[in-house]
């Protein structure tokens, strides 16, 4: 069986990507069913036992900026080795709620860690590995903020200011501009039915 595909969902907190992730994966599995392939759904930080432990630390404990980035990439290495690469090798498709673009957006754009440091970590951990497709849920920070305020107790990232998320969004869009062949941008300011219509277009293009 041919190697599987790797798809990532990205966007600032409150953009709505997690709301649509399972729906997208269910539709994708329907398409892949006759081929015998499966859809593996995962997330970052997380995806492995170590990754989930790191997730609790990263989302809830204050720490040095460079420590934060290093922990993100440590969890990613484990995630690649134990989950992503084995699934792709056996022909399954993997859909991850966040991957490396999030680290560039949050630790780079939002927190201001120099891009060259993140690029060095990316090369070390991933080599040339990149997602086959990244679905970027794009929305104005003020809209995302209103959505976040309507849900559970926020973690340390969700509690950041609109200015932080404006920088994070700008870095996401910069990444998308630099790799347009890899990104599909979804206007997530729309209603749920309209967003799903956009995602149907993404699925049709796979």
Swiss-Prot record:
Keywords: ATP-binding, Kinase, Nucleotide biosynthesis, Nucleotide-binding, Transferase. One of its GO terms (biological process) is dUDP biosynthetic process. ATP binds at residues 11-18. The keyword ATP-binding applies. One of its GO terms (cellular component) is cytosol. It catalyses: dTMP + ATP = dTDP + ADP. Pfam families: Thymidylate_kin. The keyword Transferase applies. GO terms for molecular function: ATP binding; dTMP kinase activity. Its EC number is 2.7.4.9. PANTHER family: THYMIDYLATE KINASE (PTHR10344), UMP-CMP KINASE 2, MITOCHONDRIAL (PTHR10344:SF4). Belongs to the thymidylate kinase family. Phosphorylation of dTMP to form dTDP in both de novo and salvage pathways of dTTP synthesis. NCBIfam families: DTMP_kinase. This is Thymidylate kinase. It comes from Burkholderia mallei (strain ATCC 23344).
């Amino acid at each position: 069986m041919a190697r599987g595909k790797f798809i990532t969902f990205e966007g600032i907190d409150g953009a709505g990507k997690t709301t649509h992730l399972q729906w997208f994966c269910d539709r994708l599995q329907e398409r892949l069913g006759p081929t015998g392939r499966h859809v593996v759904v995962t997330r970052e930080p997380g995806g492995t036992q170590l990754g989930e432990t790191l997730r609790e630390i990263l989302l809830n404990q204050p720490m040095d900026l460079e420590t934060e980035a290093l922990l993100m990439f440590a969890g990613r290495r484990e995630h690649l080795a134990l989950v992503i690469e084995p699934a792709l090798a056996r022909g399954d498709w993997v859909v991850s709620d966040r991957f490396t673009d999030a680290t560039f957006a949050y630790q780079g754009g939002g927190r201001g860690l120099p891009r060259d440091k993140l690029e060095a970590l990316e090369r070390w951990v991933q080599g040339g590995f990149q997602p086959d497709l990244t679905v970027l849920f794009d929305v104005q920070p003020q809209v995302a903020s209103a959505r976040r305020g309507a849900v559970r107790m926020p973690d340390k990232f969700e509690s950041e200011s609109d200015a932080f998320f404006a920088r994070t969004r700008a870095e996401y869009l910069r990444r998308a501009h630099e790799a347009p062949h890899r990104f599909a941008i979804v206007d997530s300011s729309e209603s749920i039915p309209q967003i799903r219509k956009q995602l149907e277009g993404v699925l049709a293009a796979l």
